[in-house]
């Protein structure tokens, strides 16, 4: 009985903490990552098949972006970082991949356009 009570308290504490965590939004969190690493190709007239210049264009691709970045397929980078740092390296940091994943997992919210970079 005590074990169930403690487990219930722990679960409710985690849920309360998660509810207080700030939401990851497109304009505040994801758009800066896209501008720095993705939009040179993901724009009209460039090599990528879809544009990531606006929320409306990007939103349908949220789950695919999560999968591609988590698998390190995107952004493409074929040099081996074990051999040094490369000037044009657009590889995402794990923290950036985590932001994209959280954004996709929480329904890819737009957020406030005033938060855009």
List where the protein language model places each region.
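Aromatic- and Gly/Pro-enriched helix-to-coil junctions and flexible linker segments
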Residues: 16-117
